Amino acid sequence: GEDRIEFKNAMKDLGIGMPRSEVAYTIDEAVKIAEELKYPVVLRPAYTMGGAGGGMVYNVDELKVVCERGLQASLVGQVLVEECIFGWEELELEVVRDADNNKITVCFIENIDPIGVHTGDSFCSAPMLTIPEDVQKELQEMSYRIIESIEVIGGCNCQFARNPETGRIVVIEINPRTSRSSALASKATGFPIAFVSALLACGLTLGDIPCGKYGTLDKYYPDGDYIVIKFARWAFEKFKGAEDKLGTQMRAVGEVMSIGK
């Protein structure tokens, strides 16, 4: 996750919902925020990878321990204290934008495990299998507004949470770079996200890059007639003292992808 304050302000300007949250720079600030949001809460350190230093806490004692760890893990000493939305659907889109503001969606990814399990540990499918088409279009529209606002050139991973009972959608975070999810999306679709991002960074546009049956990349859309399922590989037995438990910190050491119809 990058700067949580900048991200929160940007989403507010766009009118895109987020989980209720506040930023803390000290343990005392985090304690005060958690009391207002009510336990349990989730702590998300800024500028970390794989959810390092964060986690869900159920009381003030747990908060102090995790917050101290998170502040140390964050490059800027910043932790987001966030309302708990565990159990919601977790949905991801891999999108690409060029300097002319052309935007395409490479892949729709549905996490089979709900919010609360890190995406790197979650079973997931591409394309989305249980999410209505109108919801997918809404997520795509939000993703395009986000990457246009922050002026991403290249690939970007956008992560959302959806309450299956009320339909409420919030954005959790984005990764404005080639990420672990980008690697999965590339393998699932055959779309070379990192390579294309490099070309776009050099000044080309999506319309300049040829792409098989689509003609050029600006006309690309995900239309595979197959399903991809990813599941994680863990190695708890190799790490002394490691707890065999999943949460907001990524535990997987690898992953396996299967393709079928």
Label for each model-derived stretch:
Residues 1-54:
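A conserved helix-loop-beta module that forms one wall/lid of the active-site cleft
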Residues 14, 37-40, 50, 57-261:
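ATP-dependent carboxylate activation and anion-phosphoryl transfer catalytic cores
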